[in-house]
UniProtKB/Swiss-Prot annotation:
Top-level taxonomic group: Eukaryota
Organism this protein belongs to: Mus musculus
PTM-bearing positions, type N6-acetyllysine: K28, K44, K82, K125, K131, K133
Activity regulation description: Binds cyclosporin A (CsA). CsA mediates some of its effects via an inhibitory action on PPIase.
Keywords attached to this entry: Acetylation, Apoptosis, Cytoplasm, Glycoprotein, Isomerase, Isopeptide bond, Nucleus, Phosphoprotein, Rotamase, Secreted, Ubl conjugation
Modified residues (N-acetylvaline): V2
Entry protein name: Peptidyl-prolyl cis-trans isomerase A
Keyword DNA repair: no
PROSITE patterns, per database record: CSA_PPIASE_1, CSA_PPIASE_2
Length: 164
């Protein structure tokens, strides 16, 4: 089985930054990978297109995926509002790791984060389901618009997304 690849085209205050592509580890976490893939294509009638990265902390991560409330309190999965932690096989080994944001055990929705450093303290708490394939330089550019409290100096938006 070939793992799916999806892409995000990123803008900062409507200025194009570029494209980030992700490999989704459907071989290890099929349910979590399928949620992210379908939210990237928008095939269920809702998803990531037009949503923003509401929290970016340089040297840590870029968080997005709240397409319902746009502030980190919302989002929904393709399985209903929330779904369970599939497994913790994969670890937060360094920059480019794609992982699910949550509000505690078994509260996965649509929010996710892209690591910009090794974040091993998140192992066993957040489900890793992918990694940046191309465009880590774009993630680094996004990081420059973040701050220590996570507030962004420009609106970092997923202007387009889909499956490659």
């Amino acid at each position: 089985m070939v793992n799916p690849t999806v892409f995000f085209d990123i803008t900062a205050d409507d200025e194009p930054l570029g494209r980030v592509s992700f490999e989704l580890f459907a071989d290890k976490v099929p349910k979590t990978a399928e949620n992210f893939r379908a939210l990237s294509t928008g095939e269920k009638g809702f998803g990531y297109k037009g949503s923003s990265f509401h929290r970016i902390i340089p040297g840590f991560m870029c968080q997005g995926g709240d397409f319902t409330r746009h502030n980190g309190t919302g989002g929904r999965s393709i399985y209903g509002e929330k779904f369970e932690d599939e497994n913790f096989i994969l670890k937060h080994t360094g920059p480019g790791i794609l992982s699910m944001a949550n509000a505690g055990p078994n509260t996965n929705g649509s929010q996710f984060f892209i690591c910009t450093a090794k974040t091993e303290w998140l192992d066993g708490k957040h489900v890793v389901f992918g990694k940046v394939k191309e465009g880590m330089n774009i993630v680094e550019a996004m990081e420059r618009f973040g701050s220590r409290n996570g507030k962004t100096s420009k609106k970092i938006t997923i202007s387009d997304c889909g499956q490659l």
